[in-house]
């Protein structure tokens, strides 16, 4: 009711956050399995119920001052430490941090590639950790930022500005099953395709493709096209 003309023009898209983190972790908030098809269903529910302008301009987010840090959620244990004192002292192990950073990079790509307005909570791009408030509101780690993660966020922001299809392109689902997700953003002859694999094993996806070329805009490489199909 808030988006039908007499209340607000847009909302903080917490349902996107819930679905995105569940997909990246492979489990929902109630610990049941959660795959790409569940993420697609959640997003289609939003698309069906929101006016089109609201869906394509929603304030998409992964973290806020009211939520635990995404790196802690994506790299930490399924069950948080029991006491507030334990949560305040908690830090990811080196192995868990590597796992969490890999997921955060995927989360950032999903945030910047999906329809809506990508919003980053300060410090998430620098690799800050922390459970709930006030543990998630630490000072910015000046001089101790995760430079690789920062560069990843900056690159995604640059691509978003350079590619109109990522700003306002139509959403088209290409694949959504288990850990594998692929969708395209299309606008006036330009197509941007995002592909994700949250599993632990490499996988190959065969997607329909109509352009004569396919550039990997993140790495500068190319993907093979054979008989009108893109292999990633």
Description of each model-found segment:
Residues 1-58, 129-155, 186, 208-210:
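Active-site-proximal helices and loops of the catalytic beta/alpha 8
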Residues 31-46, 80-104, 162:
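Aromatic-anchored helix/helix-loop segment that forms the rim or "lid"
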Residues 100-101, 113-120, 124-232:
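Carbohydrate-interacting/catalytic domains
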Residues 5, 60-92, 108-147:
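Aromatic/acidic polysaccharide-binding cleft in carbohydrate-active enzymes
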Residues 47, 59, 71, 108-112, ...:
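Non-transmembrane alpha-helical segments in soluble domains
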Residues 15, 62, 218-221:
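Residues at the C-termini of beta-strands that transition into short coil/loop
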């Amino acid at each position: 009711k808030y988006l039908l003309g007499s209340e607000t023009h847009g909302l903080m898209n917490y349902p996107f956050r819930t679905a995105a983190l569940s997909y990246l972790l492979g489990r929902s908030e109630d610990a049941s399995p959660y795959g790409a098809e569940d993420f697609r269903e959640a997003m289609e529910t939003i698309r069906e119920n929101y006016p089109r302008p609201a869906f394509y301009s929603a304030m998409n987010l992964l973290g806020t001052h009211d939520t635990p840090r995404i790196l802690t959620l994506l790299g930490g244990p399924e069950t948080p430490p029991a006491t507030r004192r334990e949560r305040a002292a908690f830090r990811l192990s080196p192995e868990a941090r590597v796992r969490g950073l890999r997921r955060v990079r995927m989360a950032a790509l999903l945030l910047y590639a999906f329809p809506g307005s990508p919003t980053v909570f300060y410090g998430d791009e620098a690799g800050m950790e922390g459970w709930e408030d006030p543990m998630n509101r630490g000072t910015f780690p000046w001089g101790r930022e995760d430079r690789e993660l920062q560069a990843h966020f900056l690159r995604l922001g640059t691509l978003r500005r350079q590619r109109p299809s990522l700003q306002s392109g139509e959403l088209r689902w290409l694949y959504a099953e288990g850990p594998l997700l692929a969708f395209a953003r299309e606008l006036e002859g330009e197509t941007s395709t995002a592909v994700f694999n949250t599993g632990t094993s490499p996988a190959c996806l065969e997607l329909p493709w109509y352009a004569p070329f396919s550039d990997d805009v993140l790495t500068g490489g190319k993907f093979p096209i054979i008989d009108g199909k893109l292999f990633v």
